[in-house]
Amino acid sequence: MKDTSSKRPKSKEANKKKTKDKSNADNLPKPEEAAASEPGHPEYIFPLVLTSVSQELFGCRADEDVTAENPHKLLKKQDIIQDLRHRAAVCDFSPVKQAVLDYPEDELLLVFDRDFIYGQSFYLVLTVQAKESILKPPAEGADEQMEDEEQQEEEEEMMTKTPEPQPWVSLGSERLVYTPSAVLSSVICVRQLRYSVCPLGRRSGTRVRFSDRNALDWKEELVECSSYEDKSFSITRMERDSSTQTCRDNTHTCTQTLWKKPKNMWSQYEPREFSSEEKQHQLQSENLKNFITSVARRFEIYLQQNLIADVFCDDWTALCEDDASLMGKTETQLKEYQSFMDLHFSKEKTISHVQWHPSISGVIVVSMMERLSLEERIDSSTKLLLNPSHILFWSFSDPINPQLQLECPDDVLCFQFSPSDHNIIAGGCMNGQVVLWDISAHVDRLQDTRSGGKNILNKLGKSDATPVVRYCAVSGIENGHKAPITDIQWLPETFEVNKLGTPVENQSRTSVQLVTCAPDCCVLFWDLRAPRVMVHSLTDIKQKQEEKPLENPHGVPNTFTHLNLTWKPFIRVSLPKISSSGEYSPLRFSMRENTVDYNTGDKSVSGADSRVFAQLRMQSAKQQKPLQNISTKLYIATEDGELVYTDWKVEKDNDSGRMLSAKPLDVFLLQDTLLHTVSRSPFFRDIILTVGRFSFSIWREGLTCGPLLMSVYSKSMFSAGHWSRSRPAVLFMGREDGDVEVWDLLQNSRQPSHTQNISTAAISCIRTQTSSGNTHPYTETLHTHTHTQPPSAAYAHRPAPVTHTHTHKHCTHTHTHTHTHTHTHSRHQLHTHTDQLRVLEERVREAKQNLLAVSDRLGTLHILQIPGSLRRSSSSERQNVEKYFEKEEERLQYFEKRQSDHQKKKKETEAEQQKKKTELVTPPKQEEEVNAETLKEYQQFLTLEKLILKDMNIQNETQQTCNTINTP
């Protein structure tokens, strides 16, 4: 029996792998090959720039000592170190100083790189292996012979040998075959093993060569277990159990009692009292005396405690007013809440004005205008007529599509909602016309946006297209402004103005007048009511009855049909200059908020429900009741940087008999450029903010010394400014570079407390969120109660009137009651009640006013969320701001007094000097006159001496002595 053995052939991949490993281990790549394969240079070389001095010093001059045929030069390590010591950083080998010091041998290889393969003319070899590989490259014949030997060995290994017969060698397996007791038999196959013994390369003296290896060939050396998709998770289920629920998890609802017709009511009642006999019996009873005696001491203690400390103070609310102080940091970053931009109406346009809807939360209105200069506007006038401008109503529920569009006859620069009816909007156009809109028919669409469009039943049968509302009336071009209207404001519903500018009582309690200004040097007053009905002839009445009503294809409301194209102002206030001829050019104006007048009578019941402007008529002069507590002063900002303080009343000229405007009361020149913002503080009626191109100022009405605060000149020009409605000390400023500055006057009045970039274009308008009637259901049921009651029991037997004033959302009611029973109240209860109401109002205001609208010149509206540190005010912030303004006012008055005293003293000094100059210079006296005066003085002295001697009885004795001496 013969055993045959054969060698198992190897695969081709293994042979290739082995060959590649050997080649990589034996061959070191040349620098040229490494430069071609890698983007930089290999790690074992360093490119150098050698100056001519260094080349001569080391004997490696280019194209002389080293050439392209013989580029190698061996440098001694000690010479390089010596050069580094002498020249230090000037030495060309200073970048590789550490590599030279760490080099193990005494000579380093320097190679001349004539072709600038590595970017420089020389490169230094930093390793010994690389130096040997460059100086002694392997011969091509030896490499080929080695490859042939390796290939021959591989072929021999792969060749299958034929088995040959061999003699039998007994190993004991035949015993198992012939043994009968063996149950199992096994056949043992013996194979001959072949071993290959090779000596170690380090002992045999074989040269070892290493080479670089490409990082992309790692797959041939490793076994990768790559990820794959598990099919067990891709099995589709034929059936699946699911459930749906139709009701919403959360819903916001509110309810409010509808009170259509408020009335003034009075009620009087008297408590039940004891009779005189019963009172006498109770006062003389022992029980009453014992009770008073037992509680008298405790009552005195309670009264003392009540006077010493406020027992009704809430320590928890007074503990910490700002949450940021607990966390140790204050958040001042404005976060973008939403942004609005329409691809059609906002393209190549800018936002000129922004207003929050006063009664519908989440709705904001913007006016769009063309971004053109005057010359471009004239050239494209035909295109502008075919594409009218619009005012867009945006809602938070739909940031892509506007909810409503108001068509405008021209670009609108400013607009305002009527304070009486928020569906009436007045706007000022660029051509000088005043426009009126009525959106009463589309209020439901705007109110549906508050629910996020979830009311599907109201949307059935309605189109998704944005409705376009045409203007109801427009003023005549010949009777209006001759320049673009830059500002417009409504007069409050508490008063109106007659033709002389005098405030009179508004019996209709409806805002029917508005004020506009333009750079045409005038301020105009407009009235929405029709003029008084005049006596018409029978022919005119018959002709009017025969006229057919005009068709209304656009569905324009007939609210202001009586004003369309015939509307003209009833007061024209001019602004003559004080010191020279000419007039001021107004851009913005600010009126004092005269919303309350205590001389005004009760609200007229007949005019309370009248909302049809066409039925309202102007009052006659006899029916008008003048009001004395209404301020008629205006602050006007001009395009020349002047702040004008004037009165809108007109006076009759005695010479010409014409109605003329008086000259302004004061004029302040602030800047050389225009003032684009004049705004009153929502917390202080007499504090005004003015913003120019380079700085802003804060003024107090009636103070003529100057501004309370004037900021330093800014590097970037200001383009907008606005007061914060939640904190009295905070201002928001917009700049031309798209940044928004936040100023906190209590923190730092010289620089902004926070600056943040909002847009890449200039900021055009800034508006904080105003109070909305439907913001929160709790705000609709808010009432303010003021109780005036006797503070002591001393009025127990005297009927005391108790007045309850209820301030509701739409009206004010006064109820007067007469109480005849005893009221015992503490003064702290009244203060506590007032403080609680104030805190409640501040919290409601905080919930509403946490958004800031910022628009830019590219037509984008940014809605920013105001952080809590800029939204919540402390309980004493208003008092601190007021004290700050008072100190600034005292400072101005002090400096004004010093200046006046200095000028007065200067005038007195000049007068004295002038007086001395005008006095005549007396000529010098003659010698005779001097002698005569001296003799006269001597005679006066002798006379005085005689009188003194005579009084002392010395003169007689002297005379007698003289006579005795003279007698013989």
From Swiss-Prot:
InterPro entries: Dynein_IC (IPR050687), WD40/YVTN_repeat-like_dom_sf (IPR015943), WD40_repeat_dom_sf (IPR036322), WD40_rpt (IPR001680). Its main location: cytoplasm. Residues 141-157 have a biased composition (Acidic residues). Residues 1-33, 897-919 have a biased composition (Basic and acidic residues). WD repeats lie at residues 407-447, 480-536, 712-753. Gene3D superfamilies: YVTN repeat-like/Quinoprotein amine dehydrogenase. Disruption phenotype: Morpholino knockdown of the protein results in a ciliopathy like body curvature. Morphant embryos show a reduction and dis-organization of floor plate motile cilia and a significant reduction in primary cilia of the dorsal neural tube. No severe brain abnormalities is observed. It comes from the Eukaryota. GO terms for cellular component: cytoplasm. Residues 1-39, 136-166, 897-930 are annotated as: Disordered. May be involved in the regulation of cilia function. Part of the multisubunit axonemal dynein complex formed at least of two heavy chains and a number of intermediate and light chains. This is Dynein axonemal intermediate chain 3. It comes from Danio rerio. The lineage of its organism: Eukaryota, Metazoa, Chordata, Craniata, Vertebrata. The gene is dnai3.
